[in-house]
């Protein structure tokens, strides 16, 4: 489930002038996607606030992230916000506070295929690993 699409389809949050969604986390939690008999993967930058069995946080070196966001024509303020968030472990910290099992993966030097394989392996083994990626040198 792509969480951004799910929120738009289910009218969770308010669309801002810049096209981004402003989302009330409690509203999202009350309306989160439900798994049927099979497991589902929920992908999105707010997914770590949901009630999950397992949470994987993908990490990227802040300088690499800045290059990628520049290539996607993100605004300077949005790039800065994302880079600072990554460097300060914001999503990881929130995931650790909200989830029982967290696994982080540094994707900086990995291909999408390598990341996919690592995610599958982590899910199958229910591994837990957090706090192994450190970007404090960025500042």
Task: Go through each PLM region and give its residues.
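ATP-dependent small-molecule kinase phosphotransfer cores
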Residues: 1-49
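Short hydrophobic/aromatic-enriched beta-strand-loop microsegments
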Residues: 1-3, 56-62
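Conserved nucleotide-binding/hydrolysis micro-motifs of P-loop NTPases
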Residues: 7, 61-64, 109-110
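A glycine- and Lys/Arg-enriched "phosphate-lid" helix/loop adjacent to the NTP-binding pocket
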Residues: 15, 60-103
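Short, well-ordered beta-strand core segments
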Residues: 40, 55-57, 102-104
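Short loop/helix-cap segments at secondary-structure boundaries that form the rim of catalytic
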Residues: 47-53, 97
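Conserved protein kinase catalytic core
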Residues: 49, 65, 112
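NTP-dependent small-molecule kinase module
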Residues: 96-139
